[in-house]
Amino acid sequence: MKEFIVLSEEVKAGQAKGLPIVALESTIISHGMPYPQNVQTAREVEQIIRDNGAVPATIALIDGKIKIGLSDEELEMFGNAQGVAKASRRDLGYLLATKKLGATTVAATMICAELAGIEIFVTGGIGGVHRGAETTMDVSADLEELAQTNVAVICAGAKSILDIGLTLEYLETKGVPVVGYGTDELPAFYTRQSGFDVNFQLDTPEEIAEMLSAKWQLGLKGGAVIANPIPEAEALEHGFITNIIEKALVEAEENGIQGKNVTPFLLGKVKELTEGKSLDANIALVKNNAVVGAKIAVAFNQLH
């Protein structure tokens, strides 16, 4: 296994000193945002993690290796490269064997983080159960990963284009705690509201670190969703986003868009109808998650 994992100099030095490390995914760079905002955001997020006392480790697949921590040049390459594969659990073996470029999803980043001994991972939002999943079976592999891999995911909830109710049902079945950081309502990515409750509200990084520590000491496999609402100033109105999604769903149906094609269509509509506000919101929430994630990593590190 070790032959596949390559730590960056910064991560190697951090681990040797016993510093807290925070994992970051790379699909947000390759697939989540346009260039050059993607690379700029990735660099800023890494810096926020450093400023809050932890070491950033952006994870990606390059040349048959799992890179834990990317150089500036590698970040730039991911931001610009064409045809980067989106890597989830099923793709890791193939992409390493064929030495293709792979950007890691939430699921794959969790796997790689656990292999590298990293427990805390910051991202934008998690995947979930898609609308209409009762017929399409379209459920993100992120949820299954949360059920079996010991990594906490700090995120701004799940995107409202998903079926949030079913996503929570699935996580409940799998025994994955959904924790609200300073909130009793699950945030829905661009918006602070979803109309659904979290399982527990915790208000400090220390409390979250203690919960994670107790969970894993009991040998309870699986991660946790730490839902951190987008900052008020950048949040989009819950009603506004819901309205856009309802309209887009009708349009999708009228145009015969089905199954796997619905999500990209909805995302495109949200982007178009928010007039780019969704990109600003996306950047703001990831940065906010980086602050919280770094603080949780510091607190968790102090317990161990």
UniProtKB/Swiss-Prot annotation:
The top of its lineage is: Bacteria, Bacillati, Bacillota, Bacilli, Bacillales
Per the UniProt record, the source organism is: Lysinibacillus sphaericus (strain C3-41)
Reaction(s) this enzyme catalyzes, per UniProt: D-ribose 5-phosphate + uracil = psi-UMP + H2O
Q: Which family does it belong to?
A: Belongs to the pseudouridine-5'-phosphate glycosidase family.
Q: Which key words tag this protein in UniProt? A: Glycosidase, Hydrolase, Lyase, Manganese, Metal-binding
* Classification via InterPro entries: Indigdn_synthA-like, PsuG
PANTHER family with a match to the protein in the record: CARBOHYDRATE KINASE PFKB DOMAIN-CONTAINING PROTEIN, ZGC:136858
Q: Does the keyword DNA damage apply?
A: no
The residues that hold substrate are K86, V106, S140, A141, D142
Instruction: State the Gene Ontology BP annotations.
Output: nucleobase catabolic process
Signal peptide location in the record? none
* Record-listed Mn(2+) binding positions: D138
Under the subunit heading, UniProt states: Homotrimer.
Q: Which residues form the active site?
A: E25, K159
**Primary enzyme class:** lyase
Q: How is the cofactor bound?
A: Binds 1 Mn(2+) ion per subunit.
What is the name listed in the Swiss-Prot or TrEMBL entry for this protein? Pseudouridine-5'-phosphate glycosidase
Q: Which cofactor does it need?
A: Mn(2+)
Q: What is its EC number?
A: 4.2.1.70
Q: Name one Pfam family in it.
A: Indigoidine_A
